[in-house]
């Protein structure tokens, strides 16, 4: 179906552009220079679309700089995207990376085609409609060009909506009947709007620009009041509202993740009233009713009726959530329930059709191809191991500024990371995205090499893992605590220290079923202690855990601690679990088996209330303080670790600690006092 839809899109685009060029030549050959120059001027916004397409090609790492530039200068950049997507879709057996590339190619193509249709086809449609009406329907060339432009613009809207829907997790196949109803809906609404504006221009000329400008301002203020969160920057958000307000002069597009029934009804009611007023003024119906005026008004408004009927049929019968939508409308009309609660996420129809998907996108784990990884930046495993912390941060920033990340937000109609995380989930199958800045061939080669050279985490050299982390990344982690995830450990440099492994180097993606937090043990003055790593999960708090036991005999001198960092990268909704850092050393006391042993709140001693520890001053140690020598009396191979996990989105800053208890468990009787328990086993949340 991908190939057929791409073929239909290419056929409509070829017909529309051929008719447009023939119309320009027709005007110049017949001596109608004004219309010829106006039709030629409409082609100028196409250079903006070609420039954007070229930049996106370069952002994707496409080779061939000179040839690519020449194609875009000749206005063939969108056609090249058609060709690439067609070649990819015609492959009989698409592997996961190819399916991922096909979906990204289709998303880029649909967005560029919609932009080209709005900038070129829309003005050309208005111009040719006016020329065709001014000639009293006798000039065939403008009429044919009007028909193709009308169909092409409507299909661009349908194609954009369809491909954006494919980027959502759990998407369902859209039948041809649904596409046909959407095409009728778009053509009916668009035709009525264009005819109303053109007829009003024939009667009042440039006053139509006042009407269009007033409609633009009203729609822009309405968009501002709706508070769409797709764009984060304030300046870009205002520009986005202005551009969408201009689009709303002709057609409607939804940019909100909430049910849009009320918004759509409001928009089309306003459009209907405007069209009726424009038609009444254009046909002089108020001055005296005539049969011709009635025919004109009825003919124009019949398109609105056809579009409305097609819209109702699509959302009541052919939409994946049509059952919920229809039942919600009935409940609201009967007064049983109101509001926008009709489009629930777990609809019966969507559940029944979930197993009947006929189209899907690539997967890196199995036969289920859902584009859930599009909402997540590349993991540190996709970055070369020799790259430092700065390289990984640059990769994450490039992903968040990449245009494919914009498609994710437009598909889900939100820029809220929490909502994107909830939509894509943690365990849904996904295809592995290409590394940004690499071409498809380079990505496939790198993926094959990485699969061959991948070794188990237990066989990795700890010294290599420690050297791969850069010390200069610490200020970055401190300056940006809300968007980074860092693991910092301090280990003493003893000669006979047991080999340890950097926990962050073997991080994987956690699941909701894994453990609560990453726990790291710390050894103070004494002879026993150990370090254990737990599994991590998504959390909006920072968990710090330490264990210390008082000893009586130890004469070893401690050396200055060394700092080890491993940046795990920004994860959208997933924390990376910390694996066990070292084997259990012989002779060290075991870590407490239950949470009650390490919590001053869950203890059963005489002082079970939370008592602030004297060793916790409520501030973060500086680098100079961390580099000071440890206490003189320490056992060999003693080390302390601090595990810090920050997941997006962060709900509170690092300057606002949240003190709470550890997860509840059965209390174990202890006979130590509150002060001794706080000194030996401090555990708290930051």
Curated annotation (Swiss-Prot):
The keyword Membrane applies. It comes from the Eukaryota. InterPro entries: XK-rel, XK-related_scramblase. GO terms for cellular component: membrane; plasma membrane. It is a multi-pass membrane protein. This is XK-related protein 5. Belongs to the XK family. Residues 339-387, 448-468, 490-592 are annotated as: Disordered. Keywords: Cell membrane, Membrane, Transmembrane, Transmembrane helix. It is found in: Cell membrane. Pfam families: XK-related.
């Amino acid at each position: 179906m991908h190939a057929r839809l791409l073929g239909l899109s290419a056929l409509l685009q070829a017909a529309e552009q051929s008719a447009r060029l023939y119309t320009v030549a027709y005007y110049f050959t017949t001596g109608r220079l004004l219309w010829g120059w106006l039709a030629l001027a409409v082609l100028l916004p196409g250079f903006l679309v070609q420039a954007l397409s070229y930049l996106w090609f370069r952002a994707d790492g496409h080779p061939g700089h000179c040839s690519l530039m020449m194609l875009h200068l000749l206005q063939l950049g969108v056609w090249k995207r058609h060709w690439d997507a067609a070649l990819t879709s015609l492959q009989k057996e698409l592997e996961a990376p190819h399916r991922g590339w096909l979906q990204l190619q289709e998303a880029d193509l649909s967005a560029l085609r919609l932009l080209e249709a709005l900038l070129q086809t829309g003005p050309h449609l208005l111009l040719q409609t006016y020329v065709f009406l001014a000639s009293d329907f006798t000039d065939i060339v403008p009429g044919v060009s009007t028909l193709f432009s009308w169909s092409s613009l409507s299909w661009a809207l349908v194609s954009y909506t369809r491909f954006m829907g494919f980027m959502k997790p759990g998407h369902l196949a859209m039948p041809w009947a649904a596409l046909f109803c959407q095409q009728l809906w778009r053509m009916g609404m668009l035709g009525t709007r264009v005819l109303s504006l053109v007829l009003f221009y024939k009667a009042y000329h440039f006053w139509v620009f006042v009407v269009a400008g007033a409609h633009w301002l009203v729609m822009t203020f309405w968009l501002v009041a709706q508070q769409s969160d797709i764009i984060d920057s304030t300046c870009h958000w205002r520009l986005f509202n202005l551009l969408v307000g201009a689009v709303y002069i002709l057609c409607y597009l939804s940019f909100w993740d909430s049910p849009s029934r009320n918004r759509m009804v409001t928009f089309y009611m306003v459009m209907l009233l405007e069209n009726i007023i424009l038609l009444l003024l254009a046909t002089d119906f108020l001055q005296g009713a005539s049969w011709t005026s009635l025919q004109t008004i009825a003919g124009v408004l019949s398109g609105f009726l056809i579009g409305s009927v097609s819209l109702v049929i699509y959302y009541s019968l052919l939409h994946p959530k049509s059952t919920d939508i229809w039942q919600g409308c009935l409940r609201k009309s009967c007064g049983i329930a109101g509001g926008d609660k009709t489009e629930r996420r777990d609809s019966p129809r969507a559940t029944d059709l979930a197993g009947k998907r006929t189209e899907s996108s690539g997967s890196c784990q199995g036969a289920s191809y859902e584009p859930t990884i599009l909402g997540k930046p590349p993991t540190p495993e996709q970055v070369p191991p020799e790259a430092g912390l700065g390289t990984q941060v640059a990769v994450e920033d490039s992903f968040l500024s990449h245009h494919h990340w914009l498609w994710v937000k437009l598909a889900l109609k939100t820029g809220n990371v929490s909502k994107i995380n909830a939509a894509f989930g943690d365990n849904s199958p996904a295809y592995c995205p290409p590394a940004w800045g690499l071409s498809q061939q380079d990505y496939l080669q790198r993926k094959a090499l990485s699969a061959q050279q991948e070794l188990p985490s237990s066989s990795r050299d700890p010294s290599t893992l420690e050297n791969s982390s850069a010390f200069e990344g610490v200020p970055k982690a401190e300056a940006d605590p809300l968007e980074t995830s860092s693991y910092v450990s301090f280990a003493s440099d003893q000669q006979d220290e047991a080999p340890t492994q950097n926990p962050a180097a073997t991080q994987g993606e956690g699941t909701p079923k894994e453990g609560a937090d990453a726990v790291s043990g710390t050894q103070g003055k004494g002879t026993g202690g150990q370090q254990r790593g737990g599994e991590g999960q998504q959390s909006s708090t920072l968990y710090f855990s330490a264990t210390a036991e008082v000893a009586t005999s130890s004469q070893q001198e401690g050396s200055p601690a060394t700092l080890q960092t491993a940046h795990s990268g920004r994860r959208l909704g997933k924390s990376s679990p910390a694996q066990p850092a070292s084997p259990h050393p012989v002779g060290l006391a075991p870590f407490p088996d239950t949470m009650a042993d390490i919590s001053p709140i869950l203890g059963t001693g005489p002082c079970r209330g939370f008592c602030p520890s004297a060793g916790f001053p409520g501030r973060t140690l500086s680098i100079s303080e961390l580099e000071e020598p440890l206490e003189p009396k320490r056992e060999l191979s003693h080390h302390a670790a601090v595990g810090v996990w920050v997941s997006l989105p962060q709900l509170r800053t690092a300057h606002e600690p949240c003190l709470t208890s550890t997860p509840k468990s059965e209390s174990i009787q202890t006979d130590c006092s509150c002060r001794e328990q706080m000194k030996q086993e401090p555990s708290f949340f930051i």
